C-alpha cells in the first residue's frame, strides 16, 4: 500500500474518462512526459468514452508520442503538453497543444533521420480519424503546435 501511495503522489494528475484503456494511455504518456521535465496538463470533461476504444487509443498514443517528441526537440525553457477532451452533442473532441519547433502543418512529415521507419504516427491518426467519420486540424503558432480532433458517434 505504501508503494501504491508513492506512485499516486508521483503522478500529479490522474486522468479519468470512464474508459480504462483511454485512461491508461493518457496517464502513462503523462507520467513519461513529467519524468522528462515536460509539464503535462489534462482537461478531461467526459464521464465515459463510448467510442471505438482501439481507435481512440491509437489516436491518443500517436498524438501524445508526437507531442512528447516535439517537446524533447525544442530548446524552450518551459515545455508543456495540454490535452483536453470533451463531448459536444454526439461528438468527442480531443485537443492537444504542445511546445514545438516551427512546423509546416500543410506538410507533416517525420523529422527523424530514419524516415522510412517513422512518420507513420500522423498517417495513422489521419486514417483512424477518417474511419471514425471524424476530422482533424493542425495549427502552429509562435512556438506551439496544436491538433484538434473531432470524432462523430
Give residue spans per PLM region.
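Conserved ATP-binding N-box helix of the HATPase_c
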Residues: 53-76
